[in-house]
Amino acid sequence: MRVSSPSYRRLDIDERRRQLLERGAELFTSRPYDELSMSKIATEIGISKALLYHYFPGKQAYFEETLSAWAEQLRERTEPNPNLPPIEQLKGSLDAFLALVSENAIAYKNLMRSAAGVAEIRELIEEVRLRTAQRILEALYTQEPPPKARTAVNGWLWFMDGACLNWIEHRDIEREELRDLLLGVLMGALLAADAAPDLAQAS
């Protein structure tokens, strides 16, 4: 759906930029990067190319900002509640993450599948995984986690992305079932690594 030029002109600068980033995310995750140009993007959004260049100096800068905005939205949506026990923190973050995936299924699928060929996407996903792993380890361990725990958590994050891709493709299990499956696999991986956290102490 295109947004008309007048509606953009009525917006303040921050709101206009936010909407441009949202539309940019839709376009960059639904089409190959090389197929898009600033002219095509401006036409799809429904604004002039000059206005688009007013906010972003070029396609690469626009692309990178849309990725950064997506990562920030993910961080905010999945921020755990530190007042909850560790397992409840993980459940809450997983619920928020799966809701975001469900709401943006096509974009998520395209983002994951584009990672192999687009360095910026690959780097962003790696950054998000590292930050998520750190969150999980800080929630589960009161002291420096053992190396096996770090390895298990990082491996689990790759599993989670694969499971989410399968879920949005088939939609044959409930979101809560997937959340519990992911949580069970994480705990199982830590147990298998002989690095199961003391949840009573962590809480």
Please tell me what each predicted stretch does.
Residues A119-W158, E177-G188:
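Amphipathic alpha-helical packing segments from all-alpha helical-bundle domains
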Residues M1-E15, D194-S203:
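N-terminal intrinsically disordered/low-complexity leader segments
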Residues A61-W70, L124, V128, T132:
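Alpha-helical DNA-contacting segments of helix-turn-helix folds
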Residues L100-E126, L137, G162-E169:
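Amphipathic alpha-helical segments used for helix-helix packing
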Residues E79-I106, T142-P146, A152, W156, ...:
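Hydrophobic alpha-helical connector segments
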Residues N110, E138, L157-E174, M187-L199:
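Amphipathic C-terminal alpha-helical segment
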Residues Q19, R23, L27-A61, E65:
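Helix-turn-helix
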